[in-house]
C-alpha cells in the first residue's frame, strides 16, 4: 500500500519543507473541498467524501514533513455505515499550513486496494464536505472545529 500512496503523492509535486525530524502534525481541524483531517493527541481522523478513517496517535513527520501511518478505514460511511473498517495507510506531506495526503485501503471484502486522494487540506480551514458531514471522533463530545495548535 505504501508504494501506491507514495507514488500518488509524488505526482503532486511541491518542494520539501525542512523541519526537525520528529515534529508532529499540528493539532486541530485541517479542511478542504470534500476532505478533512482532525488531528488530536490520541487520533488522526480523516474524511474523503462520504468515507472516513482513524489512525492512532498524532502523526510524526520526518525532516521533510512526510509521514506514513497505518490505521482503519470505512469505505461506505454515509448515509448509513455499511461493512467493516478495513486496514489502511495514510501518507502525506506537510508544507507550511498545507497537508497533501493519500490513503490506500486494503478492501478485504472485494480483495483489492482502493486508493483515495490525493487530497489537500489547510490547517484551521473549515472543511467543505457537501452532502457528507464530518462525523465525530469516537468519544468526542465537543465541537469538531478544533483550534489549530502549532507545536514542534
Language-model features: locations:
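Bacterial Sec-dependent N-terminal signal peptides
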Residues: 6-25
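N-terminal glycine/threonine-rich, aromatic-flanked beta-hairpin/loop signature
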Residues: 33-75
Amino acid at each position: 500500500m505504501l508504494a501506491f500512496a507514495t507514488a500518488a503523492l509524488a505526482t503532486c509535486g511541491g518542494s520539501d519543507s525542512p523541519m526537525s525530524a520528529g515534529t508532529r502534525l499540528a493539532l486541530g481541524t485541517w479542511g478542504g473541498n470534500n476532505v478533512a483531517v482532525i488531528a488530536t493527541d490520541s487520533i488522526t481522523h480523516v474524511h474523503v467524501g462520504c468515507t472516513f478513517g482513524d489512525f492512532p496517535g498524532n502523526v510524526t513527520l520526518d525532516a521533510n514533513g512526510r509521514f506514513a501511518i497505518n490505521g482503519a478505514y470505512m469505505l461506505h460511511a454515509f448515509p448509513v455505515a455499511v461493512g467493516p473498517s478495513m486496514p489502511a495507510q495514510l501518507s502525506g506531506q506537510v508544507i507550511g499550513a498545507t497537508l497533501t495526503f493519500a490513503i490506500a485501503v486494503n478492501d478485504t471484502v472485494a480483495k483489492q486496494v482502493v486508493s483515495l486522494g490525493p487530497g489537500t487540506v489547510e490547517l484551521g480551514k473549515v472543511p467543505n464536505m457537501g452532502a457528507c458531514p464530518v462525523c465525530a471522533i469516537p468519544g468526542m463530545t465537543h465541537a469538531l472545529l478544533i483550534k489549530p495548535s502549532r507545536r514542534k
